[in-house]
Amino acid sequence: SVRQANITSQYYESESRLLTKYYQLDSQNLEYSLENLQIEYQKEDDLYMLEDKINDSQVLQLSFVQENDSLKIISLKTINLEE
């Protein structure tokens, strides 16, 4: 259906924006690059999370960690927002 195609398209656009931000990050200087690129993020312990709004009811969240001198993606998940 057209609606499903739109939702799929929104998801991939959101994924593309998140991955673009992720690959711009400097693993050697992570905190600085997050601030310098003005990327909003959350941090819990060693886990960093970037989010991008898919539509009015969903957000896509990319989680990653810094290991040695590199970044490693842990998950990419859709989160339903409360109605």
Task: Describe the function of each predicted region.
Residues S1-E83:
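Beta-strand/loop motifs with alternating small/hydrophobic and polar/acidic residues, enriched
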